[in-house]
Amino acid sequence: MSATAATAPPAAPAGEGGPPAPPPNLTSNRRLQQTQAQVDEVVDIMRVNVDKVLERDQKLSELDDRADALQAGASQFETSAAKLKRKYWWKNLKMMIILGVICAIILIIIIVYFSS
């Protein structure tokens, strides 16, 4: 036997023309790596989703605070508007009473002047 014949790789089995099939352990490792990559991708997506939910919650909280402040301001405005309306109603009533008294005095003067 020659030295080159002893170190040559074994020939492929008869009937198979392609490369030898990978060992089952290598295939399961590849599947495990693919599955792990998918899991990592899902974890990254879920982290982004959780961050978005937390950001949305913060924005909703700020919006709720602003709505409460706006409601308080609206209530205060309504109270102030009612007081102002009442104030000007009384002022208008006083003006009408004064105008009525002046008209009555003028009418009395005219009646007294022309009746004599």
Swiss-Prot record:
Region Required for interaction with SEPT8, annotated ranges: 92-116
Residues modified as N-acetylserine: S2
Domain of life of the source: Eukaryota
Bilayer-spanning residue ranges: 95-114
SUPFAM superfamilies in the record: SNARE fusion complex
Molecular function in Gene Ontology: SNAP receptor activity; syntaxin binding; syntaxin-1 binding
Cytoplasmic side, ranges: 2-94
Disulfide bonds: none
GO biological process: cytochrome complex assembly; membrane raft distribution; regulation of delayed rectifier potassium channel activity; signal transduction; SNARE complex assembly; synaptic vesicle endocytosis; synaptic vesicle exocytosis; vasodilation
Function: Involved in the targeting and/or fusion of transport vesicles to their target membrane. Major SNARE protein of synaptic vesicles which mediates fusion of synaptic vesicles to release neurotransmitters. Essential for fast vesicular exocytosis and activity-dependent neurotransmitter release as well as fast endocytosis that mediates rapid reuse of synaptic vesicles. Modulates the gating characteristics of the delayed rectifier voltage-dependent potassium channel KCNB1.
Protein name as catalogued: Vesicle-associated membrane protein 2
Organism: Bos taurus (Bovine)
Gene name of the encoded protein: VAMP2
